[in-house]
């Protein structure tokens, strides 16, 4: 099964204009596997001003999502995002195990990485590959009273 969305828009932002287009496909590979993503391009234009160095700018945002259900109790999901504005790639991986209704265990791994580490281009000292990362263990229990 295949699904998705296509969206676009034209509008104003502060004293400028914006044109945007987004495509978001989804694929249901099987009962257990779903993959999808989105790509959004936004073009901004602004009038020239004395204190403004850029009058045009294009932003690209790409996202990937995937989910796998091992069975009714265990699932794995992944979310990866790229932004040319931030010059970073972010990733989130999550494993969830549902012991019973209201009792869940999560293992979550997050990572944020730089895509442009060149000191000549950035004007900064060489950036590390990884900007931040975390590993989280979470247990939830809903009390019924």
Question: Model features per residue range: what roles?
Answer:
Residues 93-109, 114, 126-145:
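Outer-membrane beta-barrel "beta-signal"
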Residues 19-25, 60-66, 89-93, 133-139:
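Hydrophobic, lipid-facing positions within transmembrane beta-strands of outer-membrane proteins
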Residues 1-33:
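Long hydrophobic segments that form regular secondary structure
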Residues 8-14, 41-45, 80-86, 97-99, ...:
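Transmembrane beta-strands of outer-membrane beta-barrel pores
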Residues 1-6, 32-37, 73-76, 102-105:
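Repeated loop/turn-to-beta-strand initiation elements of outer-membrane beta-barrel proteins
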Residues 24-28, 32-44, 48, 56-75:
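Surface-exposed extracellular loop regions of Gram-negative outer-membrane beta-barrel proteins
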